[in-house]
């Protein structure tokens, strides 16, 4: 949201105050927004995957129906990476090895969408790797470098030059790593892309939704070079998609997470 903030404030003639409600993977912030008036003054910035994961795995006191989707802001690629001297040169090398030995992989949280993607691939390919939850992307990468896990699936953190990236979770190849295939290319059209997005309380009028969505669309169009460069600096891709697309993406993400959690019969915290 910071990428757009100054320009959106000028366009709307309204200051934007960012209130942090940390804790419980978005549950506290989500509850706050759910109880807010649908007057166009309170919004919820969270990734689609974190939002639905909090509903499925953390007993959140809200559902998708409690929010009005506004638009996406940035796409956050997920990469699967190994040590540069790893025997696994490709993602297929990893999946094939995982069918004959117990390999370990790390993600930033138990029951994260990234873990569920690997679980889904394991069911497709006939393996069950050992999941290691690690607090934070940088620590996960360091855990790979230290040889404590065989692979990590995380958002880029800036130390990718020390690793070998095997695959990326995107619909199309990432400009930052054009030689790295997507999971979709490799035959795994599995799991949601991760978008940091803007949601409003349920009942927010359409004219407000359209105005806010329009403001972000216009700001990206008029300041594309600046915002794209800043997004690249934090390993994200600036992309504004509208309420219909965000709504469908959120529902699809929810269905994927709920289905996979049910399949692995994971305990709900």
Describe each region flagged by the PLM.
Residues 75, 155-227, 252-255, 260, ...:
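C-terminal lobe and pocket-closing loops
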Residues 218, 224-247:
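Mature extracytoplasmic/periplasmic domains
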Residues 21-29, 75, 131-146, 244:
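Short helix-initiation/N-cap motifs at beta->coil->alpha
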Residues 18:
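Short conserved active-site loop signatures built around small residues
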Residues 104-180:
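Ligand-binding pocket segment of bilobal, Venus flytrap-like solute-binding proteins
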Residues 40-44, 79, 150-151, 165:
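Short, Asp-centered acidic motifs that coordinate Mg2+ and/or phosphate
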Residues 8-10, 35-41, 55-135, 193-230:
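Hinge/capping helix and adjacent helix->loop/strand transition within the periplasmic-binding protein
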Residues 1-4, 22-24, 106-112:
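Extracytoplasmic "Venus flytrap"
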